Amino acid sequence: MTDPPAYVILGRGHWAKRMHVIIAGENRKVSVIEETRQYPDENKFAYIARLTAAMIASGAQIAWLCVLPGPHVSLMTQAALEAGLHVIVEKPWYGSKEDTERLQALAREKRRLLAVHFEYLVLNEVENWKTNFHPGAALQFGGHLFLSRSDPSSIPALHNLGCHLLAIREFAVPASSVSELQCGYGCSDERLVWIEQGGQRLSCIDLFTHGQPIIQRFMRKVEGALKGIAFPFDLDFALRVEKQVNAYESRMSG
């Protein structure tokens, strides 16, 4: 039996610390690279080279980028691929179409997996939606995602939270129409998605009280993909979700 893959986490915030505990709890070797910011006098080539060297030195096979989105994520992804690691990126994906295609080409060249972490997609109920309702052409999709805490990221709620909702739609019922999306911080906690037909609710999923080990399941899906099992949550998927977020944002402001 081969040893399970080792992980290296890039980041030092709350999410990076949480992921460290979860990954270690799955009996995986895990190390951390906390210094992930580009220095003021460091060009992007030197930045990539520094991170590449640090990831090679970690001895890991999978890099998990636990950082806020931005242009640096594409550079960090490139560094991980150059180091020969598989890569998990946190949602939302802000890379351009050109960036996405370039990184996917590099991943194919290196024969490495590029995954985007949308945690709710491995819920039993979401997978049941895909089985029972896909593609959902005659259905309407809606969702609320409200958090009582404040937003530490400065990312608009529709992008940071709404992408969770629209990722569920894209995975389970991509042909459905979007009837309602509401997201925000500083409100009573609510994480709910539903599908309707003709004004009648067919099914709803409470994302707040599921109690399922969804991060661990996502890890198993990633590790399964390294053995050749199909993996749907790649950059193409993330880019489709971000396009849906932008389309809904335009629709609401138009």
Feature-to-residue mapping (PLM):
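Beta-loop-alpha module in the N-terminal Rossmann-like domain of NAD(P)-dependent dehydrogenases
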Residues: 41-88, 92-106
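Glycine-rich "substrate-gating" loop/helix at the edge of Rossmann-like oxidoreductase active sites
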Residues: 151-159
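A contiguous active-site-proximal alpha/beta segment in oxidoreductase catalytic domains
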Residues: 94-152
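C-terminal substrate-binding/catalytic lobe of Rossmann-fold NAD(P)-dependent oxidoreductases
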Residues: 175-222, 226
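Hydrophobic beta-strand scaffold residues
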Residues: 30, 47, 87, 113-114
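N-terminal Rossmann-like dinucleotide-binding module
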Residues: 1-43, 55-56
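C-terminal helix-rich "cap/oligomerization" subdomain common to oxidoreductases
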Residues: 1-4, 62-67, 112-113, 221-254
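Oxidoreductase and adenylate-handling cofactor-binding alpha/beta cores
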Residues: 122-144, 159-183, 244
